[in-house]
Amino acid sequence: MSRIGKAPIEIPAGVEVTVEGNLVRVKGPKGELSREIHPAMSITIENGALRVSRPSDEREHKALHGLTRTLIANMVEGVTKGYSKTLELVGTGYRAAKTGNQLTLSVGYSHPVVFNPPPGIEFQVPAPNQVIVAGIDKQLVGQVAADIRATRPPEPYLGKGIKYAGEHIRRKVGKAGK
């Protein structure tokens, strides 16, 4: 069995999981998520834990087993705790501001870059050079954070740009002077 796939998913108090065919719905204190899973995988709920099982030991089924279990575990954690990614703006004059629910970035272009959050995503700006992307869907939080970072990725010579908190930027040596 897949080492990841065979581990049961504990369902915390206040979280409701329903399985209808291929559709898994997870409802918790922070919201509701639903995801369609591969038809080969089967899910059983027994005494407060959810188990994912696979039909055979084929390579594809082994991979889907661990994937399905992890996706459902991420949904359960998302509706209980939520997810967030922190981005840092490094550079002179690089600033972020929240206007309503929009995020406005001044990152060295001739115009400010405006981001509208997709449903389920919230922006927080604790400092002018810091942005927190929060939500219950792990994949969506990561994608929105990656889209924001892509507006001005860190450059290797001065390290200016938008980077994830804790991300190490590989630096290059500039050209040698005479």
Swiss-Prot record:
Keyword Cell wall biogenesis/degradation: no
Similarity comment text for this entry: Belongs to the universal ribosomal protein uL6 family.
Gene Ontology biological process: cytoplasmic translation
Subunit structure comment from the entry: Part of the 50S ribosomal subunit.
Mitochondrion is among the record's keywords: no
Function: This protein binds to the 23S rRNA, and is important in its secondary structure. It is located near the subunit interface in the base of the L7/L12 stalk, and near the tRNA binding site of the peptidyltransferase center.
Top-level taxon in the UniProt lineage: Bacteria
SUPFAM superfamilies according to UniProt: Ribosomal protein L6
InterPro entries in UniProt: Ribosomal_uL6-like, Ribosomal_uL6-like_a/b-dom_sf, Ribosomal_uL6_a/b-dom, Ribosomal_uL6_bac-type
PANTHER family: 60S/50S RIBOSOMAL PROTEIN L6/L9 (PTHR11655), LARGE RIBOSOMAL SUBUNIT PROTEIN UL6M (PTHR11655:SF14)
Protein's recorded name: Large ribosomal subunit protein uL6
GO molecular function, one term: rRNA binding
One Gene Ontology CC term in the entry: cytosolic large ribosomal subunit
Species of provenance: Symbiobacterium thermophilum (strain DSM 24528 / JCM 14929 / IAM 14863 / T)
UniProtKB keywords: Ribonucleoprotein, Ribosomal protein, RNA-binding, rRNA-binding
Pfam families: Ribosomal_L6
